[in-house]
């Protein structure tokens, strides 16, 4: 219910207040209102819901911020997508390539194409390096470089992983935790890529063959909303509001989230018409943990740890080009160090309805940066000029063919996995769970996990189950805990929610569960203890 106080601020009282209208926040809001709970969602963006999964529109052109395939092994997630957006999915072919030294490589690699492009001598070096690391692997795997070198060999790692990865994260690969590699490319290896490339080259590859073993990059098609991922989240917002139980307050930033000392919450949101006060029995936050810590009252004891969490930011420069489509790919990965762009999207390849003019090609150049650095603070005009220049360097288009451009910035797009992130996250998680059991953290930034859209949704789904049950039935932090990339195997293959342990684990049970992780979570700065042979190979 909405009221206006004597001081002029708006006041609401709801069952649940939600910070952030991204996939996690809107999933929670949709399921809660469907169950009859009253909900208020605050979103600091004045125009768009969906967070990093939003779709931005500019003069009729639609831009997907980062590219979002709709695939999940969770049948509950698939069913929810279909429930929210029943009639607007299209099936799209998947095509991505790597650009390296002026040549394009299919991704996944095609064996014969890679041999032709790399040449016999370099290909032989790649295979020799791969065999060396299979015979003498790095035993103490701590960094992205260690993990990927063990999987592919040093030579192939340096060609196809190092440059692009360092563009994405802005740090050397040997300083980056192995978590990212384990999550995003687990299940792939040089041998697997070669075998799959041979099958593809000979026409023997099967699409989603039901084995549940296909790794993420081997999927051939995907579903996609015809007007971009934002179409899904616009629909979720509209359904929340249509119930009469939910409100989505746009342009409202989190000012303070205060505990009332009795398990309830008082949230202050700063909006275009002043402040809004929302009281609620439960609070769900998808805000970055670092940001949440400074706005909680009383302040958490772990605020310092939260302040040390880091993020990688992101911007897209969309160019409208008078041309046929420049390439058929959904996107191409730019491994060339001569340009700053990391990836180039072809928006029409995602959906023809994203580009209104058939005579115009529309692409998005993706740049990875830190908020406040030279790229982030550059003017839109400068960024558009840089994008035109780099497209020319790559040989994809001439600057004079560009007829329009737009820039979209996304802060805190990626939570950074550095040496201390795991202990910082765990410290804050443990404190909040003990002190504030009615405060629930969900989503990518809410949990500081580099999760996909369906993972973010699942954390919200589990949280809603807990709220409706009145107790913690499920452990939301177990979602994707094994660092296995979720987009693998058959869509909808998993049909049940993971059950939470109801008893405390014994010490040896906890140790056994911890042993399933193949790589440590943080970079270990201990002295190099590898044997002499391993050091020579490295």
Regions found by a protein language model. Name each.
Residues 125-257, 265:
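Active-site/ligand-binding neighborhood in enzyme catalytic cores
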Residues 6, 419-538:
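C-terminal lid/capping helical subdomain adjacent to the catalytic/cofactor pocket in oxidative enzymes
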Residues 59-136, 186:
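Dinucleotide-binding Rossmann-like beta1-alpha1 core, especially the glycine-rich loop
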Residues 1-13:
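A short, basic/flexible loop-to-alpha-helix module at the beginning of a structural domain
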Residues 14-41:
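N-terminal Rossmann-like FAD-binding beta1-loop-alpha1 element of flavoenzymes
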Residues 384-388, 392-433, 440-441, 484-485:
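Flavin (FAD/FMN) cofactor-binding core of flavoprotein oxidoreductases
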Residues 11-12, 225, 250-396, 400, ...:
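Mid-domain catalytic core of redox enzymes
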Residues 33-57:
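Glycine-rich FAD pyrophosphate-binding loop
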């Amino acid at each position: 219910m909405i009221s206006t106080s004597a001081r002029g601020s708006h006041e609401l009282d709801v069952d649940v207040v939600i910070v952030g209208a991204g996939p996690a926040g809107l999933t929670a809001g949709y399921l809660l209102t469907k169950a009859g709970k009253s909900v208020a969602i605050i979103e600091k963006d004045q125009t768009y819901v969906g967070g990093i999964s939003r779709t931005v529109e500019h003069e009729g052109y639609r831009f997907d911020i980062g590219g979002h395939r709709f695939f999940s092994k969770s049948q509950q997630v698939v069913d929810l997508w279909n429930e929210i957006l029943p009639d607007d999915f299209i099936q799209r072919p998947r095509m991505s390539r790597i650009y390296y030294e002026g040549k394009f490589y299919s991704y996944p690699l095609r064996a014969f194409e890679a041999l032709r492009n790399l040449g016999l001598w370099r290909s032989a070096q790649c295979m020799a390096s791969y065999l060396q690391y299979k015979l003498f692997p790095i035993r103490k795997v701590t960094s992205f470089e260690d993990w990927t070198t063990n999987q592919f060999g040093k030579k192939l790692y340096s060609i196809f992983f190092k440059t692009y990865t360092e563009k994405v994260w802005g740090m050397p690969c040997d300083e980056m935790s192995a978590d990212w590699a384990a999550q995003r490319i687990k299940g792939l290896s040089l041998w697997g890529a070669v075998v799959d490339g041979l099958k593809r080259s000979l026409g023997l590859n099967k699409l989603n063959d039901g084995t549940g073993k296909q790794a993420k990059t081997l999927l051939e098609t995907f579903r996609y909303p015809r007007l971009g991922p934002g179409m899904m989240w616009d629909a979720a917002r509209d359904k929340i509001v249509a119930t009469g139980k939910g409100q989505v307050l746009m342009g409202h930033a989190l000012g303070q989230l205060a505990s009332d000392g009795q398990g309830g919450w008082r949230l202050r949101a700063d909006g275009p018409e002043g402040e809004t006060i929302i009281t609620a029995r439960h609070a769900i936050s998808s805000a970055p943990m670092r940001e949440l810590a400074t706005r909680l009252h009383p302040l958490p004891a772990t605020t310092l740890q939260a302040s040390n969490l880091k993020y990688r930011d992101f911007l897209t420069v969309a160019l409208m080009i008078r041309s046929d489509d420049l390439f058929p790919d959904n996107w191409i990965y730019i491994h060339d160090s001569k340009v700053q762009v990391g990836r180039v999207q072809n928006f029409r390849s995602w959906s023809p309805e994203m580009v209104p003019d058939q005579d115009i090609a529309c692409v998005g150049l993706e740049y990875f940066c830190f908020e406040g650095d030279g790229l982030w603070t550059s003017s839109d005009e400068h960024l558009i000029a840089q994008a035109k220049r780099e497209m020319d360097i790559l040989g994809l288009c001439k600057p004079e063919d560009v007829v329009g451009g737009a820039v979209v910035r996304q802060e805190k797009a990626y939570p950074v996995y550095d040496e201390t992130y795991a202990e910082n996250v765990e410290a804050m998680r443990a404190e909040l769970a003990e002190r504030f059991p009615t405060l629930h953290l969900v989503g990518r930034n809410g949990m500081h996990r580099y999760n996909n859209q369906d993972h973010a949704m699942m954390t919200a789904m589990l949280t809603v189950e807990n709220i409706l049950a009145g107790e913690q039935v499920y452990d939301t932090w177990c979602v994707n805990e094994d660092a296995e990339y979720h987009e693998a195997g058959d869509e909808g293959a998993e049909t049940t929610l993971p059950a939470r342990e109801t008893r405390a684990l014994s010490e040896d049970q906890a140790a056994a569960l911890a042993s399933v992780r193949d790589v440590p979570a943080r970079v270990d700065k201990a002295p190099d203890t590898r044997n002499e042979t391993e050091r020579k190979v490295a």
